[in-house]
Amino acid sequence: MTTLVLGATGFIGSAVMNQLVSRDGNAAIGFVRTDSAAKQLSRNGIAATIGDINESASLRVAMSQASTVICCVSYVGDDEQQCVHVNEHGIRNIASIAAAVGVERLLYVSTAAVYGPGPFRDLPVNGAPLKPLSPASRTRALAEEFVRDAGGLVVRPHLVYGPGDRWFLPTLTRIVSRLDSVIDNGSAILSVVDVNLLVRSIYKLSTEQQFRYGSTLHVNEPVPRTVIDLLEHHARETNWTLPQSSIPRADAVKVAAQLGLDMHKIDMISLDHWFRSRLY
C-alpha cells in the first residue's frame, strides 16, 4: 500500500508521516511545495514529490502513485483570498483528481470549527447546522463537501495540541496573558486531541478493512477538558505564569475589545465546545 500525504511538513501532516514510516508494509510519499521541504523529508529517509494542489499536472502524477491519499492541507489565516485558493479551490482539485485517477481512499483533515462559535455540549456529528464564521472555516466546510462527494472520509478534530503546536496553546496562553486573568475560572469545556493520538486514529481509519466512504467523524479525546485544566498543565510543563485572577465572560469581552483581541478566539476559550468524539 502506498499512501500520499498532502501537506507533509505541516503540524499534522508531519506527524502523519512519522506515523506511516513507523509502520511496517507502508510506503509513504510526502507531497510538498518547495525544494527545502522535500529535502527535509529526504533527510529523514522519506520519499517526497514537489507540486502544488492547484496545479493539476503535478497533483495527478503524485496521486497516480498512491492507493490512499491523506490530505492535511489547510490555510487557517485571515486572508480570504488565500482561504479560497487553498481550502476551496485546492481541495476541490484534490477531490476531483483523486476520483479521476482512481484513488481508493481519500481522507481529509478538517476542523470542528465548521460548526461556528457555540456553545456546544456533547454535540454528535452534524448535530447542529454548520455556521462557520471565519473565511478559513467557511472554505473548509466547502472543502468537506468536495471530499465527501468524491467518496472521501472527513475527520473533524477540534483543538489539536502537542509537539509542533503553534496555534492552539500559544493562542490560549497569549489571550489569558493579555487579559491577565482566566475567564469564568477557566470553566469552559473543550474537546481537544493530542496530535499523536489524532494521527494514530487517522492511520487506523485510512487502513481499516471497511473504509468509511463519504462519511464524517469527530476525532478528539473522548473526555473533554476544562480550560483551567489545560492552562495548569501547560504552566507545569513550561515557564509560563498562569494568572491567578478570574473575570466574568461579559467583562472579558469588553476588555478584549479594548485590547483589540479577536472575539472569535475569546468565544473559543470561554464557551463550551464539546463534541461527542472518540479515538480510533
Identify the function of each model-found stretch.
Residues T3-R23:
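N-terminal Rossmann NAD(P)H-binding glycine-rich loop of SDR-like oxidoreductase domains
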Residues G116, L153-T171:
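Flexible, glycine-rich beta-alpha linker
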Residues R166-T171, D184-T207, G214-H218:
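Substrate-positioning beta->alpha
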Residues R92-P135:
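Conserved Rossmann-fold NAD(P)-dependent oxidoreductase catalytic core, especially the SDR/UDP-sugar
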Residues K131-V155:
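Active-site Tyr-X1-5-Lys
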Residues S36-H89, N93, I97, V114-P117:
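NAD(P)H-binding glycine-rich loop region in Rossmannoid oxidoreductase-like domains
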Residues S201-K265, S277:
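Mid/C-terminal beta-alpha module of Rossmann-like enzyme folds, strongest
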